[in-house]
Each structure stands twice: as C-alpha cells, then as structure tokens.
Amino acid sequence: MAGPPFALGFLRRREVVFPTWRGWLVLALLLMAGGRGFLAWVQPFLAVSAPVGGEALVVEGWIPDYALREALRVFRAGGYPILIATGGPVPEGSALAFHGNYARLAAATLREFGLPADSIIEAPAPAVRKDRTYAEGKALAAWMREEGRVLGSLDLFSFSTHARRSRLLYRLALGPGTRVGVFAARDRDYDPERWWASSSGFRQVTDEWIAYLYAKSAFRE
C-alpha cells in the first residue's frame, strides 16, 4: 500500500495562521480608515495649484468658458506680460469647429472677455492619437524656438484634476530649462470634498488618477 503523498516528497505540511474575529475587525477598520484618507487626499493632490510667478501664463484652450474667465483674472492679478493659449484641433462636427483648434478658440474667447489682442499668443498643437497634453507642450516649445524666445519660467492654467498631469507633461516637453508652475480651475460640476458622491466627480477623479499614474510611470517621450 502506497504511503501518503507527504511521504513521497511532493507535499509537506505547513501551519497557516488566520486572524481571529478581533483581528479581522482591526484589519477592516484599518482598510476603511485608509480608504477614507485616500478619498480625501486624491482630488486636491491632482487639482494642484502651485504657481512659480512665471514670465507667461499658458492657458490650456480646451477648458470651459468660466475657467477662461478665471484665467483672465489670474493673468491680470499676476502681472504676466503675455498669455499663451495652447490646444489641439477642435473635433469635427462641433459647433465651434470653425475655430480650427482650441488655442484659437481660447484666444477668441479671451478677447471677447476683454483681453487685448496684443497680449495673446496662440500656440496650436497638431492632431495626435494620444498624449495630447504632451503634444501641446511640444507645440509651445516649438513656438519658443521659432520666435527665439526663452521662457525661464511659466505658469500653466489647467482645469481641476487635470492640473498635476498637465504640469508633469509640460515639464517633460519643455525640458529642464523652463520652470513650470500651475493653477487648477475648480470644476463646478461636483463638490471636490465629496467627489465620489457624483458620477461626474467620480469619473473625473478616477480617470485622472489612472492617467496620472500612467504618465508618471509608463509615459515615454
């Protein structure tokens, strides 16, 4: 009669330790506390505002009109000599497609809001399949080369949870010679302190968190 498998050298006994009910309770409480901490931390982490007092205010042209109004207030209060609008093509079929690109659309909107035309520069980005924000930063770098202008520092005006990722990708696109600060306009569609309680807030924060992790760890120029 053959012996048990343990005797054949294929298996061996191990002692496994499981938490008691008190241990499971403590573990559950720790997970809940960590989850609540993450919920409170992640939105303001992504929607960062950290300006450096740059030589120009760069505005991502795709942001909504109320955010462009806020950008105009920041431009005037900060005493920036120029405002640079960036952005790629407006999608075909859009009512605003006649502008061609978001840089031109934002510039036109800001002029309507009262910003003098000679204070605005357009730096449109080409159509790309992915990494649109990085393409916007490269378009700005190309404009600087073409104009022979060197911006040692600039402040980027972005939108809500997109801000941290935008700053990261603009830094990569512009290189170490340009310091990049950032402003994050507030999204009016949800309460940032309870972003998980609305579909808009949940979708925006989770999408941007995943996109930021990709940009930080897997993006290659």
Where are these regions (language model features)?
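Residue-level recognition of hydrophobic positions within alpha-helical transmembrane segments
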Residues: 18-20, 132, 203-204
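A generic structural signal for solvent-exposed, polar alpha-helical segments
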Residues: 5, 86, 149, 201-202, ...
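N-terminal type II signal-anchor transmembrane helix
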Residues: 5-48
